[in-house]
């Protein structure tokens, strides 16, 4: 399973959008962006929540990355976006 997800800092509402391949419905992955990692180190993992926006099969991985890019094209201009 491949997910397009949004990780949100519940303290300041900043967020990160990404793609993650997983076999589990729930795992502890929040993202790999440098700004996001710094924020997790600063605020602690408890301050973040991850929500799945879209699910894809492994065969449709290219669609997951295309959807992520569509979202980033809109959200990268947002000052709240960690990406």
Which residues are covered by each model-predicted region?
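Structure-specific nucleic-acid interaction/processing domains
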Residues: 1-83
